[in-house]
C-alpha cells in the first residue's frame, strides 16, 4: 500500500515498523524479514498477522468474488503474506461463494521449492508460479548450448515437491 493511500493514512498503526530493533531500515529484506519488510520507504507493509488488519483485507478480496463473476486471483508477493491471511481468505471464499463456482488462487513466490510448496494446500492456494522451472525454460530456449535435460531435471524436481497432480504456473 502506498503511504498516501487512505487505508494507511487512516490506520498507520496497521503497518509493520519501518525500522528494525537494531535501528536499520526494514526495506527490501525479502528473505530475512519477508513478512514485515517494506518494499520501499513510501510503501508500508501491512501487519497481516494482526486480525484487525487481515479481516478487512480478506473481506475486501471476498467482495470482488461475491459481486463480480471472477474465477480466481493472482496473488503477488505471496511469501510476504502470512499463512493466517491465506487460510482466512480461502475459508471465507469457500463459505461465501456458491458451490457451483470454483475460485482458483495462484500465488507468486520467488524462492525455494519448500517455501513455494508451503502455500499449496486445501486451506490456502491452489497453485504457485514455478519460477525455478521458468528460469530453466528461459535458459533452455533462449540461450545456446543449454541442454533440454536441464529443463527436464527442473520439471522432475518440481514434481517431487509439488506432486504430479498440482497445476503449477509457468509464466511465458
Question: Language model features by range: what are they?
Answer:
Residues 2-8, 60-62, 66, 71-170:
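Active-site-proximal helices and loops of the catalytic beta/alpha 8
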Residues 1-68, 88-98, 114-116:
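Substrate-binding/active-site clefts of carbohydrate-active enzymes
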Amino acid at each position: 500500500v502506498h503511504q498516501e493511500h487512505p487505508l494507511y493514512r487512516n490506520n498507520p498503526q496497521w503497518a509493520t515498523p519501518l525500522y528494525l530493533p537494531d535501528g536499520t531500515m526494514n526495506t527490501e529484506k525479502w528473505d530475512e524479514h519477508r513478512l514485515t519488510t517494506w518494499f520501499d520507504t513510501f510503501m508500508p507493509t501491512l501487519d497481516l498477522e494482526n486480525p484487525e488488519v487481515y479481516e478487512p483485507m480478506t473481506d475486501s478480496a471476498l467482495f470482488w468474488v461475491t459481486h463480480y463473476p471472477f474465477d480466481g486471483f493472482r496473488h503477488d508477493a505471496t511469501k510476504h503474506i502470512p499463512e493466517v491471511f491465506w487460510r482466512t481468505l480461502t475459508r471465507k471464499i469457500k463459505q461465501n461463494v456458491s458451490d457451483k463456482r470454483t475460485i482458483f488462487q495462484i500465488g507468486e513466490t520467488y524462492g525455494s521449492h519448500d517455501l513455494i510448496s508451503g502455500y499449496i494446500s486445501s486451506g490456502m492456494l491452489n497453485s504457485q508460479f514455478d519460477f525455478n522451472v521458468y528460469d530453466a525454460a528461459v535458459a533452455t530456449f533462449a540461450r545456446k548450448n543449454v541442454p533440454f535435460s536441464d529443463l527436464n531435471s527442473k520439471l522432475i524436481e518440481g514434481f517431487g515437491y509439488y506432486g504430479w497432480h498440482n497445476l503449477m504456473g509457468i509464466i511465458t
